[in-house]
């Protein structure tokens, strides 16, 4: 198979996988972000690992990909009820903080060891996410800002989307709004226009700006007739006071 054909096949497979991941994160809101980070974003990462390892065939990036897969598994490890002892032979964590701390350490090690690889850059994104989960906003901002500035449009959009959530938590409203609008203007396969619109509308609702939120919900309905997104936007608009 010629190099161009292999490249196109890789791009087609990556687009399909990342689109599926994006669809799974449509309902991601700031309130339950920590629950969906591992489940939804891991779909994207595992797909990228499989395709990236096959396409580049570079030993260093393959090793980094294996390490990243292990770190993602840590981030998805189940939590056990408080006061319940760990079961021998079954990985678990007692709290979100304990799990995020362990995962961040793994992601940081990948970033330190493979900073110039695509996998290393993805690890930086996860360092930002886990830092946000731990309330380390300075580290979250620093790492997510770098991810948001990536030349990889998919990684950049994920970085912006997560960074906007961090800004929301810090009441940096202007910065959050700007990022959502950037994503609306230039959507990607992993962060669609609808995804960014719904998050911006949710943000306006949280700031008691129902008129602004309603405008966006109406726009979503107009641009996406007869879709689940339109139905969701209609319900949310109807619930506004």
Question: Which residues are covered by each model-predicted region?
Answer:
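N-terminal positive-inside, membrane-proximal cytosolic segments immediately preceding the first
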Residues: 1-39
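Short solvent-exposed coil/turn linkers within tandem alpha-helical repeat scaffolds
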Residues: 112-120, 148-156, 184-193, 207-210, ...
């Amino acid at each position: 198979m010629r190099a161009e054909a292999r490249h196109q096949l890789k791009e087609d497979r990556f687009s399909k996988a990342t689109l599926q991941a994006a669809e799974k994160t449509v309902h991601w809101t700031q309130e339950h972000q920590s629950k969906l980070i591992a489940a939804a974003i891991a779909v994207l990462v595992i797909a990228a690992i499989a395709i990236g390892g096959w396409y580049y065939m570079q030993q260093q990036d393959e090793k980094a990909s294996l390490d990243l897969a292990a770190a993602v598994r840590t981030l998805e490890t189940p939590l056990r009820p408080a006061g319940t002892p760990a079961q021998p032979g079954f990985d678990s964590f007692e709290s979100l903080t304990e799990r995020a701390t362990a995962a961040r350490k793994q992601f940081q090690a990948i970033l330190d060891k493979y900073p110039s690889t695509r996998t290393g850059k993805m690890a930086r994104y996860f360092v930002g996410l886990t830092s946000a989960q731990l309330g380390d906003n300075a580290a979250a901002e620093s790492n997510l800002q770098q991810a948001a500035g990536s030349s990889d449009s998919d990684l950049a959009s994920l970085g912006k989307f997560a960074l906007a959530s961090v800004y929301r938590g810090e009441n940096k409203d202007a910065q959050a709004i700007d990022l959502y609008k950037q994503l609306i203007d230039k959507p990607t396969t992993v962060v669609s226009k609808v995804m960014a619109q719904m998050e911006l509308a949710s943000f306006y609702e949280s700031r008691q700006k129902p008129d602004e939120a309603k405008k966006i919900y109406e726009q979503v309905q107009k641009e996406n007739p007869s879709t689940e997104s339109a139905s969701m936007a209609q319900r949310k608009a109807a619930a506004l006071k």
